Amino acid sequence: MTLIDNQNQTMHQALINALSTSDQIDIQVGYFYFSGFELMAQHLKDKKVRILVGKQIDPNAVPNIIAMQQKTGKPVDLERFQSWDTYVSRTEQKTKYFEGFAKLFNETQVFDNPESQQAYKIFEEKIIDGSLQIKLTNSDEHGKMYLIYNKPEMNQGGDFPGTMFLGSSNFTYNGLIDQGELNSSTRDKSDFMEAKNKFEYK
């Protein structure tokens, strides 16, 4: 087991290392923001990517998020803007999630530089061709898990299906590189397959 704390090694770099022999990544996180995809875009453009998100931000909080981002010049921790309305159906919560996600895309100035514009182009192309899927989990979830699948020629006859990361990092700039986190990684086959099965039924 290897520990990743964003100090001696960042989660960003650990994911890049594991993706070098991969053709697919499954991500389950509490929060996903474009800042996370932008960091990883060049390493994900030829991969199948599935993202499960367990929490949604309140769409009404978007102006406050934008104001805070403009003030600090850095991506914002979205957890404080979580929607706490638990009396609506999960279907309505999913609608709210994508409404809030779209508002952040449309109203923040995240595409003001060539790197962001290129990352967004990759994001858009992957959504269109189906190699990027984003879904809200069926129930409220806060766990963080990254499953990186080895290519067939790299999985040693199925004995080494991939690398699993578990811990605290959301798929955001803060979670991958900027703030203290604690994640562990393992290549154990039984642990990986158990996590894969859990991901499929979320």
PLM region spans:
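PLD/PLD-like phosphodiesterase catalytic module centered on the HKD motif
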Residues: 1-202
